[in-house]
Structures are given as C-alpha cells and as structure tokens.
C-alpha cells in the first residue's frame, strides 16, 4: 500500500542521500573529464531520458523539489519531466539519470567478467574501455538501497516498490 502523499524523508536519511549524490557526482566529474573527447552529451540532449520508475526514497525527494511546470511532454516513452528536451528537475534528478552518457560497468557474476553499457552516441560498440573508464555503480546502488530500506521502514511501505516519475 502506498500512502498518498508519501511521508517526508527524515533529515538523517536526506543528509545521507545528499552525501551519496555528492560522492557519485564527484566520480562522474572525474570520468567526464577523463572521457571528454568522447562525451557528446549537452543541454538539450534527451536521448537517454526515458520514462522509468524510481525507488520511494527518490520519488519522495523529487516530489518535494521545486520545479517549473512541464509545458510539453515528449512521446510515450520519453521522460515526462522534460520540457523542451531539458530536465526540469536537473539538480534533484535520480541517481540513474546522473549516470547517463558514461560507460557503466556491471559485474556479471555468472561469466565472471565486467559487462559495459554505454551510450552509442558517445562510444562505438567496440570502444576499448579501460577499467578506470568505467562507472561501477554497485557501491552507489547498495548505499541507495540501504537508504531506501530505512526510509520505507519509517514510512511503512514496501522497499521493493517502484514508482513512476511524474
């Protein structure tokens, strides 16, 4: 059951989430500088901006953020928080949105290797990534999941719930 509206995020969880965002943003800046000759992302590029769901913690933080009204909504699959192909919640965007455009490294435990997911506008399919080029999200996702569990426990909702961005 989803309480409507979702209860506010306690300050301790909000502060820890802010620290998580800062840590991720620092790494993103480092990787973006390292890969700047490949990154084509710029304001107005919304190729990666799709309609998806987020954890209750991030949904609550986004819902409490000031944002301009959305004047135009893209297609059925495009993120509803875009206005003229620009993010209306850019400063408060979820973690997954912050990582778009960079090469994401995932540990494939079955095959004991690292799989890479990268924007085709930035990197060719056979781009020779080095380990230091990759954004490894597992440590950040573990922290996000722990914060979400703490919030959901206090809010009395299921931690595995996913909510659409609106």
Where are the predicted features?
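Short loop/turn segments that flank or connect secondary-structure elements
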Residues: 1-43, 47, 53-166
């Amino acid at each position: 059951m989803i309480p409507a509206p979702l209860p506010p995020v306690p300050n301790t969880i909000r502060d820890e989430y802010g620290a998580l965002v800062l840590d991720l943003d620092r790494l993103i800046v480092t990787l973006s500088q390292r890969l700047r000759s490949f990154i084509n992302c710029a304001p107005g590029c919304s190729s990666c901006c799709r309609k998806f769901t987020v954890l209750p913690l991030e949904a609550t933080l986004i819902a409490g953020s000031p944002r301009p009204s959305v004047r135009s909504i893209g297609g059925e699959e495009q993120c509803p928080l875009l206005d003229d192909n620009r993010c209306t919640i850019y400063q408060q965007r979820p973690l997954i949105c912050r990582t778009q455009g960079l090469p994401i490294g995932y540990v494939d435990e079955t095959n004991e290797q690292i799989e890479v997911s990268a924007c085709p506008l930035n990197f060719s399919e056979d781009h020779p990534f080095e380990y230091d080029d990759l954004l490894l999200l597992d440590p950040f996702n573990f922290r996000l999941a722990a914060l979400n569990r703490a919030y959901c426990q206090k809010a009395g909702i299921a931690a595995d719930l996913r909510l659409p961005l609106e």
